[in-house]
Amino acid sequence: MITWSFIDLWRTSHSTLFQMTLATVLMAPVLGDCGPPPLLPFASPTNQLYESTTFPSGTVLKYTCHHGFKRVNSSHLSCDENGSWVYSTFCARKRCKNPGELVNGKVEIPSDLLVGSIIEFSCSKGYLLIGSATSRCEVQGKGVDWSDSLPECVIATCEPPPPISNGKHSGRDDDLYTFGSVVIYNCDPTFTLLGNASIVCTVVNRTVGVWRPHPPACQKIVCHRPQIPKGYLAPGFRQFYAYRDALEIRCKKGFILRGSSVIHCEANGEWFPSIPTCEPNGCTNIPDISYASWEGYKFPLRNFEVFEIGAKLKYQCKPGYRASLNDPQTVTCQENLTWSSTNGCERICCPTPDMEKIKIVSERRDFTGTCIYAYGDYVFYICNEGSYPMSTDGRSSCQADGKWDPAIPSCQADSGLQNRLALFTFPNISETNVTNKTYLFGHEENSTEHAMKGVCLKPMVINGNLSVERVIYAELENITIQCDPGYTIVGSPNIICSNRTWYPEVPSCQMEVLEDCRIVSRGAQLLHCLSSPEDVHRALKVYKLFLEIERLEHQKEKWIQLHRKPQSMKINRSFRLCN
């Protein structure tokens, strides 16, 4: 619309002013008219307007509500003096009826039930929707109604569960598998189930029933018993293990576990996590202490044993040895897994006798050690004229405490001893050589008588041999006895002449009888002629006694032969097995 101000009109030319005045006069009759009425979405004019384009002020038009709408106010439009159509909303949307309840489902109404509204349908879990999932409130004839009727919710069903190799499920072919149905799979013997043993009928995308999860598989799975040096299996062990079997692993004392203490047999036949190891957490390689033994251990300690940190081992020196000065005689396992140091054991020496006052007849000495005389060494000695040995037999031994027993080889004066001269030859016996020494005792008319008081007669050992064959043996002379083949020595093989007596006593040689072999041989023959095992047992006892008598008789005959006496008549004790 073009507007002009009053001042502008007076500034225009006379011709323009005339034209505007004329237009004002001509337009005066239509200043209050209205144009065509508005197009309403809910109503239309009742009467046809015949393409009228202008309506005078005060014109009233009647409207009719569209289908799906109903009148709620005056349905008139008025043209006011300003040339505008005046009206209020007089038609409202009609309402569809309530759709009702959906069995095993629900109806969702987003806003309202008025015409044009859309409602949605959904089924409960495990049910499938049969029908339309939505419905629209629309005009139908002169009224309104829903475009789609209520759908139906039916329970979902699944196909029969699939079979598996080397196994079966709990269902039957004629079963109806609905939502929530469960079947359980089992494997044949010696097969292991991989996966979930049970599957469930469920719904996917609200449209189809399927089994979830996927059926399991049956396979042969074997895990071998793990080898864990210095470790062991806590609950015991088997040679083979099946899928998902668990093992608890522990380490022996002195070792620490590196890795997981619990492992499981996996589907690939391997253990998971990986098999752990047992590593030393203590000291090994026990110190080798010469001339010592470990206290509290009956058998020698083994180097593969492991001792915990802080463990202490106490050792004892062997007889003839003692701990070094200020040594605690213990070793300790330290944090660096090594043993503390020790000085060990040192040899105990016996004092050396005064060689100017004694004469050694025989001795045993260890020439490889640091001592002249050490534990186990001994000497046989005589004294110079006018004295006699401190020990009764002229023998003294070096003891473990470093002292001589009975006393250090020495001599003491004999005021009643007369001069005697006797000449004897004694063996000087050592570990490496044997020589003869001559000693002067004195002389007298009866020197031979006195000398014979110190000799020994030849020992009689039946079925045995002497290392030195003589008729008589000198005082302090020692010999060795060895038995003939088939005989065993009973007693000490080494004896020494002391005060006209052999010390220790002369041993004997006893025959080695293989009684078991002879008894078994006889028993095999007895079984052929005796009726019962009890008779055989008694017969074997009698035969064993017969063998003992026969052995004693044999020894008696040999002794008689050696002493050149008339031989005894041998008794015939033949043992008849069967008549």
From Swiss-Prot:
CDD domains hit by this protein: CCP (cd00033)
Disulfide bridge partners, by residue number: C34-C79, C65-C91, C96-C137, C123-C153, C158-C201, C187-C218, C223-C265, C251-C278, C283-C333, C317-C345, C350-C398, C383-C411, C456-C497, C483-C509
Keyword check for Cell membrane: no
Origin: domain of life: Eukaryota
PROSITE patterns reported for this sequence: SUSHI
Biological process terms in GO annotation: binding of sperm to zona pellucida; single fertilization
Protein modification: Glycosylated.
Expressing tissues: Testis-specific. Not expressed in heart, liver, abdominal muscle, lung, brain or kidney.
Role according to the record: Binds to ZP3 glycoprotein in egg zona pellucida. Probably involved in interactions between sperm acrosome and egg zona pellucida during and immediately following the acrosome reaction.
Record text on subunit structure and interactions: Homomultimer; disulfide-linked.
Name this protein carries in UniProt: Zona pellucida sperm-binding protein 3 receptor
Species per Swiss-Prot/TrEMBL record: Mus musculus (Mouse)
Origin organism lineage: Eukaryota, Metazoa, Chordata, Craniata, Vertebrata
